[in-house]
Amino acid sequence: IPSINILSFLLLSSTLSLVAFARSFTSENPIVLPTTCHDDDNLVLPEVYDQDGNPLRIGERYIIKNPLLGAGAVYLDNIGNLQCPNAVLQHMSIPQFLGKGTPVVFIRKSESDYGDVVRLMTAVYIKFFVKTTKLCVDETVWKVNNEQLVVTGGNVGNENDIFKIKKTDLVIRGMKNVYKLLHCPSHLECKNIGSTFKNGYPRLVTVNDEKDFIPFVFIKA
């Protein structure tokens, strides 16, 4: 009888070991190969897609558009008689704000194993792709100013000028791959990008409420 108890104990121990081993290979602990892209939790990061269903690529030109009815594309303008335009605005379906938008390019924070595509919740810099004078050549990268407005004048490499892209669950007729933008400065919590009217202009702005944001889609320029 003692020998039977010992045998039962050994069989039970082996079974528990196999169960524990099997659990280590569930979806809670995905295997990430050296060539895949992952975050700090070792999870594979999906690609961001444009309206044609193609991944966004670093250095390629895109129009960022709010797909909601009455809204429009993001563009650069000079609204303060400054030497360089620095206002990041949003077109609308009213005469004074009609337009096709200003193309942007995405620049990665640093070289990594992410390849040449933009992935969800990875740090990028957003830069308007526009012809500019030598004086304004460094005034095309997005940043957030002290009023929490999105403006240009940022710097690639500045940890406070980082943005990220997150997928939303919004279903908008005729649109696919709907996202939101977040401003993610170093050592601070990310904030959604929303919109506001300031001095008569539709501006992009950071918002504190997690549920308050404007959706965006990306269109190849």
Swiss-Prot record:
Localization per Swiss-Prot or TrEMBL: Vacuole
SMART domains tied to this protein: STI
SUPFAM superfamilies attached to this UniProt entry: STI-like
Propeptide residue span(s): 27-42
Coiled coil residues, start to end: none
Top-rank taxon, per record: Eukaryota
Keywords: Disulfide bond, Protease inhibitor, Signal, Thiol protease inhibitor, Vacuole
Keyword Signal included in the entry's annotation: yes
MF-aspect GO terms: cysteine-type endopeptidase inhibitor activity
InterPro entries xrefs: Kunitz_inhibitor_STI-like_sf, Prot_inh_Kunz-lg
Gene Ontology CC annotations of this record: vacuole
UniProt motif Vacuolar targeting signal: location: 29-34
Gene3D superfamilies per UniProt: 2.80.10.50
Pfam families listed in its UniProt record: Kunitz_legume
Signal peptide residue numbers: 1-26
Disulphide linkage map: 84-136, 184-190
Presence of keyword Signal: yes
Function statement: Inhibitor of cysteine proteases. May protect the plant by inhibiting proteases of invading organisms.
Family as reported in the entry's similarity comment: Belongs to the protease inhibitor I3 (leguminous Kunitz-type inhibitor) family.
Name of the protein: Cysteine protease inhibitor 8
